[in-house]
């Protein structure tokens, strides 16, 4: 052993069992030396030819290893060693600079070198492991493996290199950039094998590129004219073809192997020579990106995938030949132009049960027909149809003999799988017999994924189901029918069979029964005539199914009686909906229910849905910006933004026309609602029956000159418990209506945190309130209104509530002006109350009326033995005309009033009271301070009470009210 030698030891030939440790200068090791270990040598050792079993550890400069040396390890050498010709079994570990490997070297491992070694011609069986940049592989190098390359460089294949396997993974700067054929400009981003280099090698030899751990991506176009083959493999990572590959040679081949991940073809592949072959192998299958195609146009072309051979279809005659083996495997090798020729459906009366892969190619300009019940390119599909484009396919079912004809461009019936099929410029028309029409398929009992269809569909009076993608999507005992990642764009017109109540027409699907529709949408137009139709921008009729992440931008128009029309679904029964959007206009005449999203929704929950188109219904029953009629369907996170207009209707709402037994959470409507003669109209809900709304808002104008109940949020409400509601639009009603800034007519329920800020206008005989027009036996807590309230000849008008019966108000306020020159009961808070309880309330707006009225700064008229005011105040001026009861707090009262005050001016030519004009109840612990301004001589007026027929105690007057008698006239009962 030599330890800590400043100058390197010279070890003679034949020496054995010697260790050199910490030698500043490297030792010279002679030929034939065996079993010597050199440790921590600053300069690299010179190892003679034939030396064996020697280990050099931590040498700053690389060792020079002579020819024929074997079994030698060089560890942590800063500079790469030079390895002579014929050296065998040498391992280079952690060398900063790459080793130079001589010709004929075999079995060498280079591990973790910062720069790549140069492999001389004839190097065989070598492995380069975890190198930072890629090697230059010389001509004639064979079976060379490059493993775990960390950053970019060039694998330069010599003119005669054969069967070179390139294993390149783990790009340090970007691990998602795997090895493969990349654009030369990306050389610094990851391991790169240049396309031009590879093409030169393909001209003379077969080439295989393998990624053992990382990704393999083809990033640039590659073409070759020879008959050689290219094999690309990603054993664990992604294999993606991003650049076009083209081979024109006879018998050329392309093999793509993706071991553990799907094979992704993002650019076109074209092998046009005779006998050319393509093979795909992947445990997870392969997928073609939109617009990508694989061309196999040469004679005797072949295709194989995962061990299965496919027949290549290249013309109509071969397409027709599928009838001879309906269970076979087929690919479409190139575009087929049909020349508008008639084509009998594949299978006709029999089902296709094999696989047909279009490889992204197109079948164009065919008139397909069937002689039985089915008309389509395929009559019935039980197998797999994928990666196919259809253009200018027409069908009408006219030659079918069955009484019920199903017509689609791709297939009449699908019981199998359809994937990545696109049909454009499709023309489907109805036959003169019972029929269903689909842009892609008529009846789907299987699965459709990543499909699209566009064109025209024309129904007639015999058409019972009609859909842009599928007429019907129906689950059976065999399994769930599904449509996903699919779209349709059709102009749908004509007629639909009358009163086909369990069918319908939709932009995507006519009828969905138990099926699933996900991540799909439709656009275009749908305009049909017929009675009792179910029309939807996406689905006409859906029952017991599910829809998620769906949308429709279809203008829907129906002409007929008793129809159900929706921007998304016409009739929805027990079909849950999540993440849905509709943006088309929806119009109808004399329909049963019409909605921007759904016409009628029964027992179906909806979450995260919106509608953004204008809706209109000239006559009918239910009209809603989102849903016309909602029965027992709970909604969450729903909204609308379109305008709504209608004629003589029962219920109309900016969100829902009629909502029954359903809760709404986070619901909003933006847009104007205008009807003529409707029963109930609201900015959010037309009528609500026993439903609850939490966090609801509306911000548009609500108008109906002859409607019965109008509310800025809800027209008519029965029951339910609402909270956090607000409305901000102007509400304008005509005669004999209940109209409120938030609710027109409210009966029952416990409601809290309600607010309205818009102005409210009513007509003769109306009950008008800034918040609620008429409130019956309902509890309202923490409620407010700030808009001005006006009418002409109303029955009751109030800044908060027009008329209240047996209601309870707590923490209530109003701030708007109340005005009706010909009304009957006017109040700053409540116009008229009967057995009403008011606690902790205030009103600050002025109240003004005409002759013969009851007017109060808080309540115009409050009657009933249960009527109560506790802790309330009024600050607005109150004025009225002759023969009126005019009070700073209450005009006419039989109630108990305690802890109340009034500070506004009280004036007019009627009975005046600073607090109460006419008291038949009990006033105690209350006060008044406002000025009294009588208009005629001997007019009765009092600073606290004008005329007292009841009781009063512990009351006071001050300020201007103290300058007149506290009680104008007192009568003992």
Regions picked out by a protein language model, each given a short descriptive name:
Residues 2-201, 206, 260:
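Long, low-complexity repeat tracts used as extracellular stalks/passenger repeats
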Residues 102, 125-973:
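Surface-exposed repetitive/solenoidal architectures
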